């Protein structure tokens, strides 16, 4: 979607929010909004179903009541097993990136990394993890079963356009499963 068309939709949406009869609720379903600057935009109540938000700038944007955004809580529940301690996730090491020297890759070890908090960034800094089947389908190396403890959930980021991966800032390594 080009910037002019997007600007027109947002202006009309603003009128709709103000109960102006000339306004129309923004329907951005399926729109390609990659790299769009939506900073400060009021998209409250907009339909964003299946809109591509990868790398879109949403700082200070109002997304309250927006439809179609991926719920992080629902995604975690649907794709990861729960235990009494937290969520079970899976990870590989050394395939794409060399692990930081301060990470001890051994059972019981807890690793930490600053996670990019931007949900519009599909693959960002942090400890990237995924469901077992996703990891197994992508990598032919050892797969670690890991735990994200309940108290560490504030450091978890589920990108709006995830291809299966999520990222976190703290993780406990449990065991190699493959």
Residue ranges and their predicted role:
Residues 25, 86-87, 143:
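A residue-level signal for beta-strand positions that form part of recognition/binding surfaces
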Residues 4-8, 103, 125:
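Generic structural microfeature
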Residues 174-178:
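C-terminal accessory domains/tails appended to large, multi-domain proteins
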Residues 64-124:
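ADP-ribose/NAD+-binding catalytic cleft of ART/PARP-like enzymes
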Residues 113-172:
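ADP-ribosyltransferase catalytic core
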Residues 21, 26, 31, 36, ...:
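Pentapeptide-repeat beta-helix register
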Residues 1-16, 21:
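Extreme N-terminal leader/activation tails
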